[in-house]
Structure formats: C-alpha cells, structure tokens
C-alpha cells in the first residue's frame, strides 16, 4: 500500500469512528437503586403482591377514612377531593411549600393541615394509625410515577439545608447519612445490605417494626443508631432532609407502600 492510499484509508477510518461516537448517547448511566433492589427475593415478593403486602391493611383503613365525615364540620376528604384516585401524582410531589403553613411540609403534615382547617378536627399524632393509613392510601395512587419535587424557591432552599444535614457527621459514632448511604451503600451491616436511601416506598412496612412507618420514623431511627439525639417528629430539619432525599431520588418511580427488613 503506497503512502497516499494509507493516508486516505486512515482518514476514512477516522471519519467513521467520529460518526459512531456522534451517534452514541452522551447520557451518564443512572446508577441509583431503590431499596427494593437490595432486598431478598422473599421480601421483594411481599412488596410486589398486594395480597401479601402487610401494608395493604393500613391502606384499606386509609381508604375507609377518606370517605368518613370527620370533625365539627362533618366533612370527609371525598367531599373536597372526590374519589381517592384523583390523588394520582400528589404523593410524588411532596414535600412541597404550603402557602397556608408558610413553610415546606410533607404529605402527612398536609393531611393534618386539611384535617384542622377543613374538617375542624384535631390533628392526628405522628405515626398514628389513621394518619399512616390515609397517607398510605394516597401514596398508592402515585405508584409507578416518577418522584417529581416541584421547583419552588422555598422548597429548593429546604433541600439545600437538607443536603447540608445529609453530609453532616452526627452522634457519638461521628457518621453522616452520606457515609452510610453513598460511601458504604451495598455493603453489609447487621445482616442487611445498606441501601442508597432513596425514599421511593414510604410509608413503608418494616419487618423490624412489625408495622407501617413514615420516612421521619426511619430518619429518627438512623439518628438513634449513630447515637445522636433525633429531631422531634415534624421538625423542620426532618422535613428538610425529606426534601433533599426526594430531590436526590427525582425521576425514580414511586413504589409505595414498600416492604423493608
């Protein structure tokens, strides 16, 4: 092969190579995984089959509460919102800024806000069966939809504060959320695999709890585990953390109610 032909051949290969590169997608592969992906097949089966998922007991109670008149106003959720299937997409947007509360709130807090202002009833306590049941029933309506935290200025500020908390070392063990759920994700701890901490399945039935619990309950449990003083339920710091976790998991599919070890 003479020199001129060699140059032409190499040039043709170079052009072909550049064309191939230009056709390849430039998107980075999404390495995020739901906690579901780290579970045993037996626990996964519990979550996937509604006839076996124990959280459905709470969801069924929540659907009943949806239609029950409550408080001095004798109003039900259905009186204002219609059928519960109209809640599709709602859970995927929380936490979000509430003009009534003048702060960022989670779904459970929104339920209690409606209960007080619309039903003229007493707010349900955190982790109460009625609150968790209704929250679970509403969350189910968003199954399969991507988490979609809204771009509200107040919410963005909350998630920034939450990111700071996520990276902050706390407790006698001097650990941060990031240390476990990013640096050590997929490693083993106490017989279980450390997940990436994406809140796609809350409210969740935890086998450890033998019941359904909120994301705030899980966050408080983590704080206790690293020997730190947990924030009280409803604290702005917990909501800020929830806001950051939702942003971190944006686009991942809602799978409520989850089942976890």
Residue ranges of predicted features:
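N-terminal, post-signal-peptide region of Sec/Tat-exported proteins
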Residues: 50-81
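The canonical Cys-X-X-Cys-His
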Residues: 73-84, 134, 162, 172-184, ...
